[in-house]
Amino acid sequence: METIKINKWKNIVILGAFVMLLGACGSKAKEDNSLSRVQESKELTVATSDTLFPSSYYNDDNQLVGYDVDVAKEVAKRMGVSIQFKEYNVDGQVASLTRGEADFAANDFGLSGDRGEKFRLSEPIKHSFDSMIVRKSDDSGIASLDDLAGKKAAGEPNTSYMKLAEEYGAKLVTYDNATNDQYLTDVANGRTDVILNDYYLQKMSVAALPDIPVKILEDVYFNPNETGFLFAKDNQALHDEVDRVLKEMKADGTLKEIFEKYFQTDVSVPSDKEIQKVEK
């Protein structure tokens, strides 16, 4: 009987060790190698759109540039790695993170709402708020967000802007990674009535295409926000390193140089405009 008891205890010990071994293997499988992978490959892969002026677009020399793009390039430079961009629409950029096709996404992504539940969010690289582009001739019949009911709102599907427009009763007209001139032309000719988006992006887009008769609706500003980069939830090590570099860029003035190049204003601090907070 004594021998049987001893054998039982041996079996329990062996089984316990086996379970611990399995647990260790499982922990190792979940190990965060997001930063070491980039360091070993010496390359950052960044998802962006290439159609969002002035955050991500092709210039006259056919070079991919823009505020978010240039910030990402500087991050890669300071990390001592090269950078490649993969171009998608908004849904594609988000999906590229979950599929592991990109290390992070850089495309004027807002850092508010439920986004933090699904992704890791970088340090803010821009403070902004939202506005509406309408026709010059008649303001598209819009004087407030309440007037969106029945109007045709243009944008990419599943964005916070389109969700907000829908909440106010707008009819959604969706585009797939369209260029700014297409968006603005469609508002001007009546195919659509309004575009909800980031104020600074809209301001620069309207200024860059002065022959298209559209404008930003004055004094109707809403949802103060911050923008930055998106990371997959599991990529904490890479996220933390990029955040370290972004803080360094803020401290030494490099981030200021980049945003003044594209926005001609200080987007490092919240605006002093009167801005309405609405639900998204």
Question: Locations of the language-model features?
Answer:
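Ligand-binding clefts/hinges and TM-proximal coupling segments of bilobed small-molecule sensing domains
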Residues: 27-31, 160-175, 214-217, 246-280
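Extended ligand-binding regions for polar small-molecule ligands
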Residues: 26, 69-78, 159, 228-266
